[in-house]
Regions:
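Alpha-helical transmembrane segments and adjacent TM-loop junctions that form the membrane-embedded core
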Residues: 1-101
Length: 101
């Protein structure tokens, strides 16, 4: 059965991601031990005016840094726009085609 890493290791991974150049913020980090290795995921917030390519490059760099500095098999990253509401989680989007939209 898998389990999360200890708080110290999770904080260290968070710090590594947060210190990646051009990452504005990090949230929703999840970790799992897989044997003696770590599988993690994180939402990274980047400047909303960047291109998709630039946002992807930042996420790739965050992943590289985590895999280099920690016993990580993988870091799955989700790129979110910085300082914008997260419309994916918790908010209801109103359909513009509806009579009330």
């Amino acid at each position: 059965m898998d389990r999360a890493v200890n708080e110290e290791e999770a904080a260290a991974i968070h710090k590594t991601v947060a210190e990646t150049p051009r990452v504005k913020s990090v949230h929703n980090i999840r970790t799992r031990k897989m044997g003696d290795m770590i599988v993690a995921e994180a939402h990274v917030e980047v400047d909303a005016t960047l291109t998709v390519e630039a946002g992807h490059d930042i996420a790739v760099e965050a992943r590289r840094r985590v895999m280099q500095r920690h016993r990580a098999l993988n870091l799955m990253t989700y790129v979110d726009p910085w300082k914008r509401p997260d419309l994916d989680h918790g908010a209801v989007l109103q359909d513009k085609r509806s009579p009330t939209g």
